[in-house]
């Protein structure tokens, strides 16, 4: 480990509150350290070779939010990926109702996407749509704007574009992922942040995949939980997909409540996971990075405490730098970085309080057991 990270480590016998009290300027100092460690790497254009290829240009929602070559997710290229109606420029998207009437629409691959490649990435990148009509076509490739994070525990990706929805579901299938975490709304401040890639009822077809709506549950101000059945038409196999959408996270901001956000995290963890957790907001760096940082540290803390009954050390700057070395710009703002600490602190305190209650309850139960049989008059 780089020795310069040691100064930011929170030891097992300390706490985040003590860390804040002992280092009043720690947020600014740590975030500046993160920028210093990662900003040069994000400017090296050779690190983004596939993302910058002309044929992949329209697959990027934002021209300055791109995946590193070495950590990008690759999708398989199949001969019949684009054969669905002998038209290699179109993607089939169909809506099938219960009467088996098939209402198909076709989306031109060259009709939607980024208007151009400007800066590769900057730490002050605005999560605003750079999209345009575009007049350059794309060809089949293994490229999708998505990155493996934390050694493949997560995949962080942009909100799908209309012309990348098929690629998105293909990635879900190939990576054997059954959990999708969505941290944006489809539209925010009158701007499209994510194109809709799922049906609200019945089913829709995306290329060689059918996504069937099963059910949903809405908890106001926290989440919409959806269940889908994903069918691969090429091998006639199906899988269950769990889709969790956090509905109250403002772009570039932070959730109002750490408690509400941690409830959302607990809902995600309730489902047994297969494959990487696929996380996206709009660009796949700010809100997505914040979720991954919180989720990974809270999971580490809970596991370590359950096994050893003591808290592990925490080094948030080290984690964020590692994440940014896998996808540029992860945990995009200082406020998001601060929110990580606040949410992690609350989650840790919750675990400790539960353990204290458990011990008190155990102590009480032992003291309440009579040592002899009941007395009789």
UniProtKB/Swiss-Prot annotation:
What are the Polar residues biased-composition ranges?
A: 113-123
Q: Where is the composition biased (Acidic residues)?
A: 78-91
* Keywords assigned by UniProt, alphabetized: Hydrolase, Protein phosphatase
Low complexity bias locations = 92-102
Name the catalysed reactions: O-phospho-L-tyrosyl-[protein] + H2O = L-tyrosyl-[protein] + phosphate
Describe the family membership recorded for this protein in Swiss-Prot or TrEMBL: Belongs to the protein-tyrosine phosphatase family. Non-receptor class subfamily.
Name of protein: Tyrosine-protein phosphatase 2
Q: Which organism is it from?
A: Dictyostelium discoideum (Social amoeba)
Task: Tell me the gene name.
Answer: ptpB
